[in-house]
Amino acid sequence: MRNDLSIYRTYAANWWDGSQRFLRLLHNLVPPRLAYFDTIVGSWRGKTVLDLGCGGGFMSEALARRGATVVGVDPSEEAIRVAQAHAESEGFKIEYEVGYGESIPVADHSVDCIVCVDVLEHVADLDRVFDEVQRVLKPDGVFLFDTINRTPLAALVIVHLGETIFRLLPRGTHDPRKFIRPSELRVKLRKRGLAVGPFVGLGPRGFNRRFDFTFGRLPSVQIMYMGHAWADPHGKAASGSAVAVSGQRLRNAAM
């Protein structure tokens, strides 16, 4: 069962105007996520990148700014319309499509990288999503993601404090039963022939002038974590050595 994500339709028109605190928090998460992904990919220029669950386009535009050819997919028609309009106003040529992770509207083996943030803990069928990830990635492609760990601490911080007490997020955004342990994620990806690199913690590191959280890497993966996986023809898991994507060497992001 998929989470109730009607908030992304309700607030789509406010995606870029800074009026909604939870959207500002999503925007503030882009720099640390991208800083980590940069260490894996190196140069984005010339790569075809799928932003899976793109929402109103925060990550898509950041990737386009780095020179990637970006395809953004999201189930919210309202968010896609906002993303397309904003990209055009900024001069970005980003292809946006309405679609779900369980049935990605992208051709087989057509993308160099998939970026999937704030998504995996919401989808209806995680196994189907990973089947689709495997299908659309090129043989030397890389899957970059983040999600929320299924721990009591994550449920306390994200749901009880974040949604109920401090109301940083709309209530009902997250179902802690859908949070994903790193060990579970690793097993699912390996079943699909993907080697998995080390996981990296992600969380609040301070405040900005609007007293919104800013984010960065953390030593613990007990709440949120980032990771990457890639097609491994030899069936070997990540071991801390470099891996190849589109002819370039990727550096593992072990802390």
Outline where the language-model segments fall.
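A C-terminal cap/extension of S-adenosyl-L-methionine-dependent methyltransferases
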Residues: 29, 90, 96, 165, ...
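Acceptor-substrate binding/catalytic loop of class I
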Residues: 147, 167-184
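Conserved SAM-binding loop and adjacent beta-strand
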Residues: 18-37
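N-terminal, positively charged/glycine-rich alpha-helical extensions of SAM-dependent methyltransferases
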Residues: 1-17
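Short, flexible, mixed-charge acidic loops at enzyme active sites
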Residues: 154-164
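Feature marks short, surface-exposed loop/turn motifs that line or immediately flank catalytic pockets
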Residues: 14-15, 151-154, 203-206
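Conserved SAM-binding loop
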Residues: 34-42, 47-155, 227-229
